[in-house]
């Protein structure tokens, strides 16, 4: 938009706000109770009186613009931002307005509104008519309104598809090469994919970047958490033109899009789906390297591959193989053209929801199963047992524990074995550490061999198909009364890497017999229980080293 038009738009907005009170002298209707999640687009009237609850100044209630707000904004959040109501809520009058461009970002009254390049409808707010109803710190019940009619309840935010956890950026082609018509077909396809993903607060989150002469982030992961809002946002994206510069756009997306401030979630795979119509106009290999370094899984959706006569214009005919996360066929996807693409939606969604295949997100911190086998024999003693638990906790807290990330389990042994918790019992670091801290000391003899066999069978057995790499960390202070070599060898054969940590009277021969190869880097010993702390970093480094070697 020309800069000369911006002051005119701002002046128009101010004149509109000055005139609004003249039109506000209406019938004394009772304000309709709404929630903080109610948006401008939920109000179907040109003018409406609503009653906002308190607590609508939180960041989750998104606001786009200043003075004039995009209709996707929270009404009550906008009212707080505008200064019409305070944090305790109150009556608000809402006026529906046409759409516009360049909704500005302004920090006002404790709310940082967000920028939006364009939206199809807007609204403005003024102070509403007072009523006998008063806003409280919670949403007002709409079960029995004064009119006696049941009001339609504002729907709560959907959790989404919990089996498809991913933070996804769609990088669409906005170049002159694709043109306006195919650009719109591309947007329709992306909308269908977004709808099938099952977007929600606990499911996939999506954002959109347009590749053109200069890349533009159209909206971030945090902006929308419902499919309906995402579809609206995709519809409003305008065609930019210019060269595609896909490499430049991919690099920009990898570096700028996936941050905590823009809504990326810890432990969730980061994905970029790159749409290329024909071929990129710049080098894309370096951008693919940068994306992998940032832990981003790059998918390439190529449309209308170059014909033999056009190959001379392509900088690198192997651009797909060099840009994707892994050149194994999983991360590349081809469609012959933009017509009749519905049949391609589901296969792409299935790929995006297969988190165990997201190789570029896999690290030693989020893709391992670690079981701790803890000696609870009488020779340890209660105070030293607490030091052993502290050692275990210090290792466990380093890893990204989640339902799709690292898993932790613990078994205590004497002559008997007790599963303190299995891999599937706790999916958060906080819960794992809390349970570890409260394990009760058993006391008894030492049968380490039986304990290894028990752990392989009962702890690792149920998760034998897990994509994570398996590790067993054994902590013991004495000689086992049974053989450890046979059970340890069986564990090695089952793909379990063993680290043995001995204290005090633990025989070095037993530690080496249990440890994986090379023995020198998988077996550790300390004379005192206080000497366990320095070994924490050795075990963590060893786990990461073994994990990286397994990925090569």
Swiss-Prot record:
Which PROSITE patterns does this one have? LCCL, VWFA
Q: Where is the VWFA domain?
A: 167-352, 369-539
Question: Keyword annotations for this protein?
Answer: Disulfide bond, Glycoprotein, Hearing, Repeat, Secreted, Signal
Instruction: Describe, as the record does, how this protein assembles with itself and its partners.
Output: Monomer. May form homodimer. Interacts with type II collagen. Interacts with SLC44A2. Interacts with ANXA2.
Tissue localization of expression is: Expressed in inner ear structures.
Which Cys pairs does UniProt list as disulfide-bonded?
Answer: 36-52, 56-76
Q: Which GO terms describe its molecular function?
A: collagen binding
Where do the record's region annotations for Disordered lie?
129-161
Q: What does this protein do?
A: Plays a role in the control of cell shape and motility in the trabecular meshwork.
Instruction: Outline the extent of the LCCL domain.
Output: 30-123
- Predominant location: secreted
The terms describing its cellular component in GO are: extracellular matrix; extracellular region
Q: Which CDD domains does the record cross-reference, listed alphabetically? A: vWA_collagen, vWA_collagen_alphaI-XII-like
Which sites carry carbohydrate?
102, 223
Q: Which SMART domains match?
A: LCCL (SM00603), VWA (SM00327)
Chain coiled-coil ranges: none
Name of the gene encoding the protein in the UniProt record: Coch
PTM remark = N-glycosylated.
| Pfam families (alphabetical) | LCCL, VWA
Signal sequence annotation: 1-26
- Can you say what this protein is called? Cochlin
